[in-house]
Amino acid sequence: MSQTLMEGVEVEAPAPRSGGILGVALPAPQGWMQGLSIPFYGCGEPVLVDRCVTAEDNPLNKTAVAEFNPFAITQSATCSSLSRLDQKKHAEERLDSTTEWAVARQLATDDVGLGSPSFEDGTSLGTVADGDFVLAVGTLEQAAADAGFGTQWWLHAPVKAAAFLARLDLLNGRWSPTGAPWIISVGYPVQGATTIRLWVTGSVWAAVDDPFVLNDLDRRNNNDEAFANRSAIVAFDPCINFYIDVTVPASP
């Protein structure tokens, strides 16, 4: 009696996670593939004068500009052609699923080494002990208010922080107690087993383009390869750039 080998059915990849930088950040303007120039919108204390005083024509606050460059993200997939799996589709869906991580890691660390501002250029506000996230968030928001003189600020946290923030009502939807947006991203690094770092920055912009996928079938060894690539950019107003560490119990 002959036996028939049943073919498995390839499952569809789940949709990329919602939220994160790509779900919350402001859309980068057209032409972002040439790079973005972000003026330091908030870095300038307003001058209070009597309205009858004649002002001098000398600007007190000179505009500073930060430059952010685009970068590439790539993923790949390979398998025997005998598997009959769509490697081109696999590579593209893998790219879609991991783009958020790549964009967030670039914002946090300038992992590509482009010289763009990142969280690592921020100013430390110290360490808060015993999981006191209320004090940590309050300290961050006050620092942002003082540095930006009223300009918008955005709060950032790794996934590990989300449960702590939600329990203390510091993550209402995606808003802080003052109404600033939170970005909780899978790509933000955790500092250690007992330390969670939170950041605050100026406004954030991000964009990615559609994937470009290359597929190659090596018939000599039946190897099916696919490479998915896309361009991305992430930028923020670095006038506000602070971080604070919070100590927590070690995970099991």
Locate the predicted segments by residue.
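Extended, solvent-exposed, turn-rich assembly/linker loops in the middle of proteins
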Residues: 116-182, 186
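Flexible, glycine/threonine- and acidic-rich loop/arm segments that mediate assembly and lattice contacts
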Residues: 1-126, 163, 168, 225-252
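Sequence/fold signature of self-assembling virion shell proteins
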Residues: 174-252
